[in-house]
Amino acid sequence: MQILVTSASGANGDGYGSLLSFSLDGTPRGTFSTDPRITDPRGLSVSADRRLLYVNSGSDRILALDATGNVVRDTGEIPGLNAGGGNLAPNGRYLVGMRSARTIVAVDADLAGAPQNVLPAGIVPFPRGFASAEDGTLYLASGIGPEGEGENSIAVFDAEGTPLALRFITDDAVSPLDLAIAPNGNIIVSSEFPFRAPDAVTSIREYDRSTGSLVRVFAPPSGVGFHQPRGLRFGPDGHLYCVARDNVMAFDFADGRFLGSVVEMPRLNGQAVVFFPLRTD
């Protein structure tokens, strides 16, 4: 097993603009794939059989890679895609956040065919992370964009895209950057509040899946660098992981304890993190 991280580059990244691999102890293993179609990557998701890795590339395309890092599926260029996060839905389709269009689209797992809107364009001012529950309920983090546009909330939709709640949470100290669903069904959000402020408070926040009430807050001890938190992922060990500007942090989800920085790399500027089998696994 290995840890894979997308490192952002460009105007809003200043990272490495590639898909990086790390051993479970945090040792860098280099670039997972050197395919030139992977540029300034963002969202990541692993297929249910753990054989394919889906990657949202900054070249306006979606790719699927095998365990050797070879591209085995490619949508081709999708003009205007500007993909953010990506997640496989319970129905097997791959969901992608379109930042410019401010919506979520779906493509078939084989990456054939044109993307189909899951939600109307402009459904939120600036989409951040999202995730689907087992019943198809879709939770979409609505955050602040690079130009300061947006709002800080979570919108909820049923499996058909009908809005259930456009402001699911009431939290005056959150600015969502990614969203995940915990094993207990609650909603997890990485936050930097106020967004991009020099003195921003960074945290990971858990909300009750039924009421939207804040349950608890995860954060490392003071003095431990935790800047620009982004992608969230539950590992095979059940721990909660969050990739940030210079590291990947781990928390014991059962009791909330900070377990340490499992990856440390200056200018990582991580966007998404996943666990993916090695060829020898």
Predicted features, each with a name:
Residues 8-10, 57-58, 98-100, 143-145, ...:
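Short loop/turn segments immediately following the C-termini of beta-strands
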Residues 4-6, 54-55, 96-97, 139-141, ...:
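Residue position within the beta-strands of beta-propeller blades
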Residues 23-27, 65-70, 108-112, 157-162, ...:
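Short loop/turn segments that connect beta-strands within beta-propeller blades
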Residues 27-35, 70-77, 113-121, 162-170, ...:
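A short beta-strand motif characteristic of beta-propeller blades
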Residues 14-16, 35-49, 78-94, 100, ...:
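Beta-rich, blade/repeat-based domains predominating
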Residues 245-281:
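Blade-level signature of beta-propeller repeat domains, shared across WD40, Kelch, NHL, RCC1
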Residues 1-30, 276, 280:
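An edge-strand/N-cap motif at the start of beta-rich repeat modules
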